[in-house]
Every structure is written in structure tokens, then in C-alpha cells.
Amino acid sequence: MITIVLLILAYLLGSIPSGLWIGQVFFQINLREHGSGNTGTTNTFRILGKKAGMATFVIDFFKGTLATLLPIMFHLQGVSPLIFGLLAVIGHTFPIFAGFKGGKAVATSAGVVFGFAPVFCLYLAVVFFGTLYLGSMISLSSVTASIAAVIGVLLFPLFGFILNNYDPLFIAIILALASLIIIRHKDNIARIKNKTENLVPWGLNLTHQDPKK
């Protein structure tokens, strides 16, 4: 019984639409009607500012971490923490508290990885922010980090680097999360190809995007 309750709790944690609620409560703004219409971290930064964007990121990240740690906190045996984390990501993407229309799963997925394999998460953070500096695009950084996660989970155990052993479930979860993130960024990928993707106000913009075109 406790297993079922905690699995439901993991989904409900993921379903907390932090950006949407922050916009409605503190700014009287519905993020779905502004910018990209997304309720995640990036659109929150653009529409509501740095403080709201950072708060959204922190909540979205750590709800993934907390969900992943639920079975450890309650000394639950028999179900991998990754399953709880996956349910949080599903909740974030399809939140019951926001009409099943959620974010792109980047921050919450990162939180899940942090809760299960923090050093591997650090590797992905380096990839993410390195790509962000070079390309000035959150979307490109998210997709690149997703691809790097797949490469890392498949290759690192061969060399005993960061990941010492192959974990079939971790591989499957990484493949699922990476696929979800890339699919959720399909419109961004199209804009990157057309060189019209939105930029952050720093970095090198090596692909010469011009969102005003």
C-alpha cells in the first residue's frame, strides 16, 4: 500500500506547475498567454524575470530529486528510485494540476539524475552550460545534454569513468528522458535549423541565430 501511495505522490510532486502558479499568484500573468506559452523555466525567465525564473528552476529541479529519494526516505524496498523519478517527470510533462499541459521536462529530469547519480548530473551540467555559452540557446543546450546523457550512460561504464557499472534500468530511463526532452523541443529544433531560435543575452551565438527574422 505504501508503495502505491508514494508512487502517486511522486507523480503529484511532478505535477506542481511552479512557473504557472508563480505567474498567476505573484504577477497575475498566465504564462500560457505570453512568450512561447510554455510554463517551464525558460519562458518564466523571459516573461517574469530572473527571480521567478530561478524559483521555477529550483522547484522543478528538486521535485524530481525529492521524488527519486522517496523510496530511500521511507526505506522502501523492491522499487527502484528511478521509477519514482520517472513518474515525477511524467507529472511535470502532463500535470494533473494544469490540465495535463506541462513543461519540457529538462529541469525535473536533471533533478532525477541528480538524486540517483549526482556526479553524472555534474557531467551533464558541464555539457549544458558549455553549450549554452557557445550557442546562447537553452533549447540547444537541453538537446545536447540529452544526447550527452545517452552517450555517457552507454560508454562511461566501459572505462569505469563516472559510472562504474552498467545499470539496465538507468540506461532505459536515460533513453526515455532524453527522447522525451528532444521530442518536446521539436519546434525549437526547427527554429534552430531556420536560425530563428530565441537566445539568452550572453554567450557566443556561434550558429548566428536571429530570432527577429
UniProtKB/Swiss-Prot annotation:
Transmembrane segments: 2-22, 54-74, 80-100, 110-130, 143-163, 165-185
Chief location bin: membrane
Keywords assigned by UniProt, alphabetized: Cell membrane, Lipid biosynthesis, Lipid metabolism, Membrane, Phospholipid biosynthesis, Phospholipid metabolism, Transferase, Transmembrane, Transmembrane helix
Membrane topology: Multi-pass membrane protein
UniProt key word Lipid biosynthesis: yes
EC number, UniProt record: 2.3.1.275
A single GO cellular-component term on record: plasma membrane
GO BP field: phospholipid biosynthetic process
Biological or metabolic pathway of the protein: Lipid metabolism; phospholipid metabolism
GO MF entry, a single one: acyl-phosphate glycerol-3-phosphate acyltransferase activity
Alphabetical list of InterPro entries matching this protein: G3P_acylTferase_PlsY (IPR003811)
Compartments (UniProt record): Cell membrane
Reactions performed catalytically: an acyl phosphate + sn-glycerol 3-phosphate = a 1-acyl-sn-glycero-3-phosphate + phosphate
One Pfam family per UniProt: G3P_acyltransf
Classification via PANTHER family: GLYCEROL-3-PHOSPHATE ACYLTRANSFERASE-RELATED, INNER MEMBRANE PROTEIN YGIH
Function, as annotated: Catalyzes the transfer of an acyl group from acyl-phosphate (acyl-PO(4)) to glycerol-3-phosphate (G3P) to form lysophosphatidic acid (LPA). This enzyme utilizes acyl-phosphate as fatty acyl donor, but not acyl-CoA or acyl-ACP.
Subunit organization: Probably interacts with PlsX.
Family statement: Belongs to the PlsY family.
Protein name: Glycerol-3-phosphate acyltransferase
Species for this entry: Streptococcus pneumoniae (strain Taiwan19F-14)
GN (gene name): plsY
